[in-house]
Amino acid sequence: VFPPDVNAVFDHGKRDVSSFPIATGTYYKQDYSAGVDISKYKNIPVPTSYMAIQSKFDFVGGYEEDVKGGLLHVADHHVSPGKKQWTWGNGDFGRAWDRNLTDEDGPYIELMTGMYTDNQPDFTWLQPYEEKSWKQYFMPYAEVGYVKNATKDALLNMEVKEGKGKVILYTTGVNKDVHVFVKDNVNGGTLFDLSLIHISEPTRLGMIS
C-alpha cells in the first residue's frame, strides 16, 4: 500500500524505474507492456523490489485481501522518505522460498522504510558526537482496505465505484466528538458531513453520490 501520490517506483540504486501501480514497460527484466498492476502480488512473477518515488504522505503499508488485514508504518516523510516493498514473486522460484520459510502461511511481502534516505544503497553521514533521532510507528489494522491517508491516530480509506464514494475510518484509540467531512475541491461544496459521538473501531461512514 503506497500513498496515492506515488506514480513511479525504483529498484536498488535507481537503476531501473517503472510507472506505478500500472507498469507499462520492462521492470526486473519482465515485460509489463500490456499494462500490469504491480501493486498486486499475484501479478509479480519474479523476485522484485520497488521503492516509492518521493511522497508527501507519512505512511506506507501492506494489506492482505483474503484476511482483510494489514500492517502500516507511519512517520514524518521529511525524516522518513524511504518506502519499500519486496517480494519473492508469484512464480516457481518464489513459491519454493515460501515452502522453505514457512510451514503454512504462504507468500509474504517485506515492508521496509528508510530514515534520511529514499533508496536502499544510499547512506548519510553521522558526524562525531552528532545524534539523530526520530519517531516511527508500526501498527496492525483491519477491515479498511487500501489506505489513502494515515496518522498514528487514524487511518482513512475512500473508494469510488460507479459514481459513488465510500469512506472508511479506522482509529488506533477511542476518539470522541469526531467530525468527518469531504469537500469537492473541483466543483466546490461539501459532499459528506457527519458528526460521531465516538469511534474506536473500523467504521463505514456511508456513500457519497
Label every PLM stretch briefly.
Residues T113-M115, Q136-F138, L169-T171, D184:
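Active-site proximal loops enriched in glycine and acidic residues that flank catalytic Cys/His/Asp
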Residues F2-E131, M139:
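A contiguous, surface-exposed recognition patch within enzymatic or periplasmic domains that forms
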Residues V144-N175:
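Surface beta-strand/loop "capping" patches
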Residues I197-I208:
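Single conserved hydrophobic/aromatic residue that forms the stacking wall/gate
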Residues A75, D193-S195:
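Short amphipathic beta-strand/extended segments with alternating polar/hydrophobic composition
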Residues G165-D193:
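Beta-strand-rich binding/interaction modules
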Residues K132-V147:
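A general sequence property marking short-to-moderate contiguous segments
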Residues V1, Q136, M158:
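Acidic, contiguous internal or C-terminal segments within carbohydrate-active enzymes
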